[in-house]
Amino acid sequence: MENLKKMAGITAAEFIKDGMVVGLGTGSTAYYFVEEIGRRIKEEGLQITAVTTSSVTSKQAEGLNIPLKSIDQVDFVDVTVDGADEVDSQFNGIKGGGGALLMEKVVATPSKEYIWVVDESKLVEKLGAFKLPVEVVQYGAEQVFRHFERAGYKPSFREKDGQRFVTDMQNFIIDLALDVIENPIAFGQELDHVVGVVEHGLFNQMVDKVIVAGRDGVQISTSKKGK
């Protein structure tokens, strides 16, 4: 599995050219993309500026001497490469297993090209087997939790080391055990209207390319948005 993730990450790095502003994703597959960018800077003299999607990725990038700016210091991002927890046949996805979904979406939105790197196990016909992360402000988080309980969404507060997990933006995450999401676009819109919800892990019709590493090698699929 790690080899597949590495293959996908290295393939994605081939899309990066001198002079680009590059969004560096977060997670186990995006990790290999960031490592390959660091190698290319060191060995090939690749010249880029990067923005990151989490404190974890920032630390990794700094260790590789990748030049960084904040998202507010750039007008746009040429290419962002990130992982995904599930990807359906309509190029909708669930992200946020690593807890960085808000920053990931903030960086993805001004990106001219948005690429996901995944192994083939992440491809699904319908989203929902992976718990859907919802980032909520700490104030009133219990109210949001009870709202999700009443709706039958089987919520749980994400925890780390016995405490509630706190994101880089100092919010909580409520994971929803939905089993299947029949209409991701409509459900995303529903979540957008829940007071106290900052962002959710549905990335609907945002991605341009999906790089999938499997037993038969690497395949690149392009969405309607990316064509």
Curated annotation (Swiss-Prot):
Binding annotation for substrate: 26-29, 82-85, 95-98, 122
Domain of life, per lineage: Bacteria
InterPro entries cross-referenced by the UniProt entry: NagB/RpiA_transferase-like (IPR037171), Ribose-5P_isomerase (IPR050262), Ribose5P_isomerase_typA_subgr (IPR020672), Ribose5P_isomerase_type_A (IPR004788)
Keyword Isomerase: yes
The protein's assembly and partners: Homodimer.
Family, as annotated: Belongs to the ribose 5-phosphate isomerase family.
Full protein name: Ribose-5-phosphate isomerase A
Pfam families: Rib_5-P_isom_A (PF06026)
Keyword annotations from UniProtKB, A to Z: Isomerase
Any GO BP: pentose-phosphate shunt, non-oxidative branch
